[in-house]
């Protein structure tokens, strides 16, 4: 694309159309941009639109499009074309910083994100001047520019908070500190001075406090991995100023908004985080400053209101206290009973209260409430912080803390009992306090795994939880009922089984609750209970125990999906999946009705897939329906095809990218259930599966390969007879896959199925070309993964067509090549083959080479006979060689960037491991002994002579054992 006004105008028009609410206008525009983004100058044109357009909306749209383009395409992935030309990369890096700093804030944020994406790949090695260019802008004195630099630096450096330690990381952080730490400190001091100068200018203060917050975030990132020498030397400057800012109260910066945190709250929140980091990780160096921070943060907590805008500040302040009280260094600060009582009364109990804002979220923003409460994204909530503080205090003072809090729990429950209708929030806080007190260790899988022995969880369940679960009106007091359900879920590993069984039918009844939170919690609790393990690796709750409630459970789960707000509730769908899995054949009578409901739901969500987890569990539930029903009666497979194929056809025709990989997996499962034939409906689809466009998306590759394997397994003869013109297309797919380090193993899966199932004559003309392609890949890019797959393939070929055919095809490509492959690949590398089936294939293939290939006995290949036998005995007896060369680098499929749908494996569509040799060989060691006996009978004296002169003693001893086990001997 040329850099000219015409192209700028065209691009502007298409960007405008991507903003249209009409899909008929929007989608073609999106497709057009997708089709041209591979052209040189495309990103430069986007930046030109961003810079020159008079329309602010178009400028922002261009910035967002540019950022997403960078996100998808900047990383260079091995085996894949470079999607951005080198001149474009250079031009982007030369211009983007200046463009970002001179743009309005909305655009600045997008470009700042783009810089951090580029920086993640290129900084510092391929973009060495980035930091210097940014630091130089500190001198500008323009805080719009300075904040742009700080924002970009923050997005660039925040990954230091969660990266694993490595020499490469240390080198990068050292470079950043050497260039950035001193200017950042000077800027920090200068900004604080300016705050004092402009103490009465609200507009100036807003900009300056934004800067201070960003500077504080950078401090956190740069200090996270280790305490840098520079910051240790300058601790006085940073900590004194942090403390002053923490105690600052400027009326101008206070906001009337009760929801949104103001600049002062955001800054103080970050300073609490910074202090907590130092208290936790660098307690020795931080000790002189700790008492004044404890005092300042304590004062902050007891003087800050209950408004939502203070939530982040209060939770970070409490987290600071939690991190301090857990450290043995600071234990003395909390030993006094009065201190513990004061913390409980003034900090913990007030911040555990269920506020009107929480009630609003529970009723009107249930999805966010659930994510926060169930999935642990409540990291910034007051309740979570208060709970962490309770746990921290219990580390050293479990007895006193439990005693103090038990008094509060009892008084809260007494208040509730006086007037439940008015005082229900007291019981809510009591349950939360008990949960905090009792929880010592928790996992997603098991709930609470270690509990405070001073809290009787079972007694609390009987006295206070069961009554809410049993309440005949499921819609009364939804918060308390949700609390009760969550209590069962949280303490499921601590409560006795009889109490859990008592809870199950009650939880089933709560699936009917109108409250989204309540019926979601009920579904989630049931799903978690159904995954608990009992003795002998079985489920704790058995299908027999569920029998009285099975119909009600399935009915209520599917009805819950019809409650407004829960039509795509992932917790309900996961509970459906888990119920199917637990109940197994008990669901068969209900499937004719339920499959219609599942299919209808699939049709609806395929119009606009927006809930990936819901969709995944929906497909898992379909797979379970198919597996369980067809296990009992394989003939029912046709009724599933009848129900599902119309929806599948629509999904494939509309190219619903998120669902296509799932459809292929379910089709594979269905096809694999058929006896050895392919129905015509599948054969009609076969040519479409070979279209190159389908194979462009990495997420399609594993399920498509499996589906093609199912076609070959069930109908290779039919393909050879009626669709032989498609065999080149099938091999074209293999050729594409084999060229990629990420997908070569998938290419071998396909090739092995072709060799195993296709009639020999159907692929004779292609065999030589297949081997040539494999050799070209071996020469150009040999990896351990490829070699292992190659070994399995050539040995399968030996098993299928015979060792002579294998030797001849190698030597036909190039004289003596067979010997080279045996010597350079098979003998040294076979020890690396992993997997029982793979090892068996290699063993049987090598046995055939040793005993059924005359060239191994009568030509220059004879010298390889004993080493090959030794390698085979090593495969049987030695541990697997899992070493990988130092310089080898595998591309992980999940690591490939971009917006493509990643492959999501359906657990319940799982394919059974296939053994192409099967029962024909049960023990390869016995087969070796029998085959050597047969060979020695054909040429007496030769085999013992070769063994005695060339095989090491240890290998001979193993071989002797095989011969004895097979009751044969060599002659």
From Swiss-Prot:
One of its GO terms (cellular component) is nuclear envelope. Pfam families: CAS_CSE1, Cse1, IBN_N. Belongs to the XPO2/CSE1 family. SUPFAM superfamilies: ARM repeat (SSF48371). It comes from the Eukaryota. Disruption phenotype: Morpholino knockdown of the protein causes strong expansion of the gut lumen, due to excessive fluid accumulation. GO terms for biological process: body fluid secretion; protein export from nucleus; protein import into nucleus. Signal peptide: none annotated. Detected in larval gut, liver, exocrine pancreas and part of the brain and retina at 96 hpf. The keyword Nuclease does not apply. Keywords: Cell membrane, Cytoplasm, Membrane, Nucleus, Protein transport, Transport. Disulfide bonds: none annotated. The gene is cse1l. This is Exportin-2. It is a peripheral membrane protein. One of its GO terms (molecular function) is nuclear export signal receptor activity. Export receptor for importin alpha. Mediates importin-alpha re-export from the nucleus to the cytoplasm after import substrates have been released into the nucleoplasm. Negatively regulates fluid secretion and plays a role in fluid homeostasis by down-regulating cftr activity. Residues 29-102 form the Importin N-terminal domain. Interacts with cftr. InterPro entries: ARM-like, ARM-type_fold, Importin-beta_N, XPO2_C, XPO2_central. Gene3D superfamilies: Leucine-rich Repeat Variant. It is found in: Cytoplasm; Nucleus; Apical cell membrane; Basal cell membrane. SMART domains: IBN_N.
């Amino acid at each position: 694309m040329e850099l000219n006004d015409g192209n700028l105008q065209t691009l502007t028009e298409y960007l405008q159309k991507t903003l249209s609410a009409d899909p008929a206008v929007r989608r073609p525009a999106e497709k057009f941009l997708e089709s041209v983004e591979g052209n040189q100058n495309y990103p430069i044109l986007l930046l030109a639109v961003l810079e020159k357009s008079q329309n602010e909306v178009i400028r922002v749209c261009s910035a967002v499009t540019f950022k997403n383009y960078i996100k998808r395409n900047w990383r260079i992935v091995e085996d894949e074309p470079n999607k951005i030309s080198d001149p474009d990369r250079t031009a982007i890096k030369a211009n983007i910083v200046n463009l970002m700093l001179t743009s309005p804030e909305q655009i600045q944020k997008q470009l700042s994100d783009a810089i951090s994406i580029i920086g993640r790949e290129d900084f510092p090695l391929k973009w060495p001047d980035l930091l210097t260019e940014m630091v130089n802008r500190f001198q500008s004195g323009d805080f719009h520019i300075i904040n742009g630099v700080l924002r970009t630096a923050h997005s660039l450096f925040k990954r230091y908070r969660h990266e694993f330690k490595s020499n490469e990381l240390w080198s990068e952080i050292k470079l950043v500190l050497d260039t950035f730490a001193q200017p950042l400190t000077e800027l920090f001091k200068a900004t604080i001075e300016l705050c004092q100068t402009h103490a009465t200018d609200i507009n100036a203060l807003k900009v300056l406090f934004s800067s201070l917050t960003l500077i504080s975030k950078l401090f956190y990132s740069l200090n996270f991995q280790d305490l840098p020498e520079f910051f240790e030397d300058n601790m006085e400057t940073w900590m004194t100023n942090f403390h002053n800012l923490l105690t600052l109260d400027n009326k101008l910066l206070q906001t009337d908004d009760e929801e949104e945190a103001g600049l002062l709250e955001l800054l103080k929140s970050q300073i609490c985080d910074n202090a907590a980091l130092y208290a936790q990780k660098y307690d020795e160096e931080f000790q002189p400053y700790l008492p004044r921070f404890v005092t300042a943060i304590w004062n902050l907590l007891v003087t800050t209101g209950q408004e939502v805008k203070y939530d982040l500040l209060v939770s970070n302040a409490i987290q600071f206290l939690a991190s301090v009280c857990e450290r043995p260094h600071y234990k003395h600060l909390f030993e006094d009973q009065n201190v513990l009582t004061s913390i409980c009364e003034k900090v913990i109990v007030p911040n555990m209260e269920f506020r009107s804002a929480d009630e609003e979220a529970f009723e009107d923003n249930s999805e966010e409430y659930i994510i926060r409460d169930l999935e642990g994204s409540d990291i910034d909530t007051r309740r979570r912080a208060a709970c962490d503080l309770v746990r921290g205090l219990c580390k050293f003072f479990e007895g006193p803390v439990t005693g103090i809090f038990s008094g509060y729990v009892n008084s809260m429950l007494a208040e509730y009992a006086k007037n439940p209708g008015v005082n229900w929030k007291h019981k809510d806080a009591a349950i939360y306090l008990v949960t905090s007190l009792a929880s010592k260790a928790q996992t997603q899988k098991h709930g609470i795994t270690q509990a405070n022995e001073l809290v009787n969880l079972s007694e609390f369940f009987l006295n206070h939880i069961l009554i809410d679960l049993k309440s005949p009106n499921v819609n009364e007091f939804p918060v308390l009922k949700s609390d009760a359900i969550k209590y069962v879920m949280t303490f499921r590993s601590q409560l006795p089984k009889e109490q859990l069984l008592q809870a199950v039918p009650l939880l089933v009844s709560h699936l009917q609750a109108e409250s989204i939170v309540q019926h979601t919690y009920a579904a989630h609790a049931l799903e978690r209970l159904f995954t608990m393990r009992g003795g002998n690796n079985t489920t704790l709750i058995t299908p027999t125990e569920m029998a009285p409630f099975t119909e009600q459970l399935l009915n209520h789960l599917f009805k819950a999906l019809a409650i407004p707000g829960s039509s795509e509730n992932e917790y309900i769908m996961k509970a459906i999946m888990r119920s199917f899995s637990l109940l197994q054949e008990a669901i068969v009578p209900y499937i004719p009705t339920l499959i219609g409901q599942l299919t209808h739901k699939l049709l609806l969500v395929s119009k606009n897939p927006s809930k990936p987890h819901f969709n995944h569990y929906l497909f898992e539930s379909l797979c379970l329906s198919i597996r369980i029903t067809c296990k009992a009666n394989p003939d029912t497979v046709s009724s599933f095809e009848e129900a599902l194929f119309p929806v599948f056809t629509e999904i494939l025709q509309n190219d619903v990218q998120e669902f296509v990989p799932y459809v292929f997996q379910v089709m594979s499962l269905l096809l694999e259930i058929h006896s050895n034939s392919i129905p015509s409906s599948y054969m009609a689809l076969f040519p479409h599966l070979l279209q190159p466009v389908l194979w462009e998306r990495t997420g399609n590759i594993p399920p498509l390969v499996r589906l093609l394997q199912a076609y070959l397994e069930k109908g290779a003869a039919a393909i050879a007879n009626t669709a032989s013109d498609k065999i080149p297309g099938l091999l074209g797919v293999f050729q594409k896959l084999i060229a990629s380090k990420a997908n070569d193993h998938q290419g071998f899966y396909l090739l092995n199925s072709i060799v195993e199932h296709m009639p020999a004559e159907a692929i004779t003309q292609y065999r030589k070309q297949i081997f040539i392609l494999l050799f070209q890949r071996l020469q150009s890019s040999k990896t351990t993964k490829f070699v292992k797959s190659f070994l399995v393939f050539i040995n399968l070929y030996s098993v299928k067509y015979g060792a002579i055919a294998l030797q001849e095809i190698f030597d036909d490509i190039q004289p003596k090549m067979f010997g080279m492959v045996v010597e350079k690949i098979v003998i040294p590398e076979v020890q690396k083959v992993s997997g029982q089936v793979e090892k068996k294939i290699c063993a049987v293939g090598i046995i055939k080479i040793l005993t059924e290939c005359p060239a191994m006995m009568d030509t220059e290949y004879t010298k390889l006979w004993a080493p090959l036998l030794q390698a085979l005995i090593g495969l049987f007896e030695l541990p697997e060689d899992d070493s990988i060369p130092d310089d080898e680098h595998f591309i992980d499929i999940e690591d490939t960037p971009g917006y493509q749908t990643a492959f999501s494996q359906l657990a319940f569509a799982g394919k059974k491991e296939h053994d192409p040799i099967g029962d024909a060989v049960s023990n390869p060691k016995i087969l070796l002994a029998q085959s050597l006996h047969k060979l020695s009978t054909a040429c007496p004296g030769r085999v013992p002579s070769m063994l005695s002169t060339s095989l090491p003693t240890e290998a001979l001893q193993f071989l002797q054992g095989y011969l004895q086990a097979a009751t044969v001997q060599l002659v």
